[in-house]
Amino acid sequence: MSRSETLFNNAQKHIPGGVNSPVRAFKSVGGTPLFFKHAEGAYVLDEDDKRYVDYVGSWGPMILGHSHPDVLDAVRRQLDHGLSYGAPTALEVEMADLVCSMVPSMEMVRMVSSGTEATMSAIRLARGYTGRDSIIKFEGCYHGHSDSLLVKAGSGALTFGVPNSPGVPAAFAKHTLTLPFNDIEAVRKTLGEVGKEVACIIVEPVAGNMNCVPPAPGFLEGLREACDEHGVVLIFDEVMTGFRVALGGAQAYYGVTPDLSTFGKIIGGGMPVGAFGGKREIMQQISPLGPVYQAGTLSGNPLAMAAGLTTLRLISRPGFHNELTAYTTRMLDGLQQRADAAGIPFVTTQAGGMFGLYFSGADAIVTFEDVMASDVERFKRFFHLMLDGGVYLAPSAFEAGFTSIAHGDKELEITLNAAEKAFAALK
């Protein structure tokens, strides 16, 4: 029995499902989840000392690669001064200044401790600001596990085939209107009917929780226009895309400015951090300036701020995102060529340093229906074949993959060699 199998068996005694986040259980791909003990650069090392090229990157934060020495040094320096104060620090002021200088929509920002907390708070703020109750989200998009957002959600909800989580009261769900992603006409029609009741539209500008689905041409622009017409707050959930698809996030990449944005993952450099912010007029409604309450014991935690500040400064160097995108493109082109050579229906998607892999004969992946029509069983086999070849992909057909600046020619060679063998075995 492997060390991972032993640990997983032990974990199930006191941890529900043996994991602390559902997708880690490998339920959607089968087999025993890997337990890791070390990560460095583009690699993770499991408890049985097998090394893998990592395309999960802790689900997005590790854009520099694992254990970047500058980030580790920043955290070590802060450790000498304490773990948490529950009081303001200079680091959180520096972080706020830096984020607002990078992201087009950010005039004010508040730090929280997770992406879920950020989206939950942004929606509460939008409701308080507008005096309206209803929200619009999109089918297959995941915005964290707060009650009102677990209606037809993506990510783990898709992985386990549970679009509406038990435990969400009907009274909460009735205020959540769910529309098809990339369908701007459905948005216009709905706002034309109930626009005066809608506080906000929340959207992943790139849907990263039904794998990776970029916006159709005109979709984000159409959302901006529709929100302006009906007095609705437009929220971009940039927990995945923020600082990854471009330094200023998807809003900079696509040239569409939301009213509020939410962030997580990269902003903490691997530490548990989230943030939300946007227009000063709206953000001034947050306590203690305004009546909308939001608070957090560990918000602005100095260790997390140290890691996040260092990460954001490092990714600000000229050419960083071009290099990240170029590697991702080379890797995806190589996968596509090998799938085509093996006669395997296969489609890839990309937004900067994030990507999607679909076993599908479709010309493109644009809608939730396109995603759900992909061959999940074939993905399961591919996942394990790649794992055997030393490549760790996201353990679900509905999760995006991530590259880092630490991925280079050697990692590309390992990845494509493993893929060539995997596609041949899938015939």
Curated annotation (Swiss-Prot):
One of its GO terms (molecular function) is transaminase activity. Pathway: Porphyrin-containing compound metabolism; protoporphyrin-IX biosynthesis; 5-aminolevulinate from L-glutamyl-tRNA(Glu): step 2/2. It is an enzyme of class 5 (isomerase). The modification N6-(pyridoxal phosphate)lysine is found at residue 265. Keywords: Cytoplasm, Isomerase, Porphyrin biosynthesis, Pyridoxal phosphate. The keyword Electron transport does not apply. It holds the Pfam family Aminotran_3. It comes from the Bacteria. Coiled coil: none annotated. It catalyses: (S)-4-amino-5-oxopentanoate = 5-aminolevulinate. GO terms for cellular component: cytoplasm. SUPFAM superfamilies: PLP-dependent transferases. It is found in: Cytoplasm. One of its GO terms (biological process) is protoporphyrinogen IX biosynthetic process. Gene3D superfamilies: Aspartate Aminotransferase, domain 1, Type I PLP-dependent aspartate aminotransferase-like (Major domain). Its cofactor is pyridoxal 5'-phosphate. The keyword Chloroplast does not apply. Its EC number is 5.4.3.8. Homodimer. Belongs to the class-III pyridoxal-phosphate-dependent aminotransferase family. HemL subfamily. This is Glutamate-1-semialdehyde 2,1-aminomutase. It comes from Pseudomonas aeruginosa (strain UCBPP-PA14).
